[in-house]
Amino acid sequence: MNEKIPGTRWLRIIAPVLIACIISFMDRVNISFALPGGMESDLGITSQMAGVASGIFFIGYLFLQIPGGRIAVHGSGKRFIAWSLLAWAIVSIATGFVTHEYQLLALRFILGVSEGGMLPVVLTMVSNWFPEKEIGRANAFVMMFAPLGGMLTAPVSGAIISALDWRWLFIIEGLLSLVVLTVWWLMISDRPEEARWLPEREREYLITALTAEREARRSEAPVSNAPVREVFRNSGLMKLVLLNFFYQTGDYGYTLWLPTILKNLTGANMA
């Protein structure tokens, strides 16, 4: 009875989730290297339009946040992310062929829509696989995507622009998303009950633990749908929203503009 429970889920769930999140991060911020790497001059983009092109992504990003989470709960997060990977791969490749700034704006908006459900879906999927005593560590691994994505995007983008040009940056990273799509589809499953690759002892452990936790939550505090008005009146939630707003503003403001600032200050290329 004291035999260690197999940890297959850590590799088969966390690894593809983390890789997919890293690719999504790279695809959303690679424009920060493309703009000073030749895109601005080739397309005649002003600083104001560059800001719009960077920011319009986040308008599209809003649309699938809540629907994505609901799909993961009631449907298949695996299929949702697979379609998302396919969509943003196509959009990224298409961005490599733009000839006008308004084409860029449209594609950046669509990219935001296609990536919008990513984080709610993967965090919901993780909750289907890890009991409460493991969920904190599992989520911490997933949230490593931002620093890891930043570490990878800068040297990879610089190398591609230096060796080829900014158009190939979008094309190559779009093709990389298709590779990740294949890995995602082959490795991951929505729930322990559906995973043929899962050892039986690990499956029994997960189903027993997760079912017991759900039953305990259901008996302690039955969940009901709160009116939208009540959600916005929740002061604790609004403080968290405001805190995250300022964090994301500073984080992405820094990430999206730092390459341009460094080029203007130093006159260096993007390699």
Sequence positions of predicted segments:
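Extracytoplasmic
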Residues: 12-50, 68, 118, 254-259
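Extracytoplasmic gate region of multi-pass secondary transporters
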Residues: 32-33, 229-271
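Interfacial helix-cap and linker-helix signal at transmembrane-aqueous boundaries
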Residues: 39-40, 71-72, 156-164, 262-263
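Conserved MFS/SLC helix-loop-helix module at the cytosolic interface between two early adjacent transmembrane helices
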Residues: 63-102
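Cytoplasmic helix-loop-helix junction between adjacent transmembrane helices
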Residues: 107-145
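Helix-breaking motifs and short loop linkers at transmembrane-helix boundaries and internal kinks
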Residues: 44, 76, 97-103, 114, ...
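Helix-loop-helix hairpin linking two adjacent transmembrane segments in secondary transporters
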Residues: 142-195
